[in-house]
Each structure stands twice: as structure tokens, then as C-alpha cells.
Amino acid sequence: MTIRLTLLCAAAPTERDVRFGGDTPLDERASGQVRGVAGALPAAPSCLTAPSQRCRQTAEALGRAPVVEEPKLRDMDMGRWQGRTLDEVAAGDGAGLAQWMSDPEAAPHGGESVAQLCARIAAWMDGLPDDAGRVVAVVEQAVARAALLHALGAPRQSFWRIDVPPLSAVQLTGRSGRWNLRIAPVGSGESL
């Protein structure tokens, strides 16, 4: 049986303070945006969610039941950079930031490297049972990037070349170890 995996990137609050590993709760406007896209997502037996507050709130705002937390879908561990802005990290550890953004094996912050994140997400994807059917998961943007790299067999250096805005959906189909990116035509009336 083919697995149909839809990854929905969590919504972002209106007043967004972008920080490494930031977990700002959703405001009413962001929750309304989630409800607006809910109908475009496929039906699934449950909605998996990463453990962050904004992923859980996004999953709950979809109105799908039950919402099941999946710890393996957690965001990248940013170590010492956790809670800091890009500007703060650049000012305090510019060389480390440059290394991290150019070398997927690097983890100058003492947390998880891009390569480690990619390996964790690949293991989760390939561990899905072949009879999983439809799977919908709300994830952070880094997790969606890692899943795309795995599905396409793309080099990990491509991680930073993928722009994944909040509430964007990625659909992958296949079986463990063999994945395809599925792109739906605009205006087809076809849901993801």
C-alpha cells in the first residue's frame, strides 16, 4: 500500500519574534488562518504533531481528531542558540553561524546538526508502516526541509535552499525507503 504523507508547517503568530527554537503561541488571527486551510488537507485517521506549542495549536485548530504528539518530529535542537535571534547569534558567534549554515555536519551551538536532523527525520519516515495509508503531520519548517531532502535524495547542503513558509503543505507518497514529491495542480479542486 502507498503511504500518503502530508506535512503541514505550523502557523506563525501575527507578531512574529523569530528565534532559534522559538515556540510562541498562536494568536486568534493565526488560528483563523489554520481553520481557513483545513479543508484543503486530506482526511486521515489522526493528525500527528511535533511537540512544540505552535505545532500542537496548529493541529488542534485544524479541527481533526485525534491529535497525536510524535516526539520524533520535534524541531532541531539549537543548543546554546536556543531562544536567540539570528542577529544575536551573528553578533556573538558569527564564525559558528557561518560554519553551521555552510556545513550540514557542523553543530557549533552544541545541539543537533542539519545532518543529524535529516537522519532522524529519514528514520522516522522510513519507519512508517507500509499500511499507514494517509498520514497528516504538523511540523516545524526545518522538519519539512529534512523530509524533502530525504524524499528527493538531495544533498544535505540543499537544506538552506528550501523556503518553507508557515502553513505550507508538502505531500510525499511512497513506501519506506522510496519517496516521491507530489505536486498538486492549482485550481484542480484536488486536495492535497
Residues covered by each model-derived region:
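Acidic, low-complexity terminal tails and accessory targeting/binding regions
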Residues: 1-4, 76-88, 149-192
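Short, active-site-adjacent cap segments at secondary-structure transitions
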Residues: 14, 54-56, 75-76, 143-146
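Active-site-proximal alpha-helix that buttresses catalytic centers in soluble enzyme cores
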Residues: 2-65
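Short beta-strand scaffold positions
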Residues: 49-50, 119, 138-139
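Generic beta-sheet signal
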Residues: 5, 45, 131-142
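Phosphate-handling substructures
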Residues: 25, 62-121
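Conserved histidine-centered catalytic loops in small-molecule metabolism enzymes
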Residues: 40-72, 98, 150, 173-192
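Generic structural signal for well-ordered alpha-helical scaffold segments
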Residues: 35-39, 118, 122-129
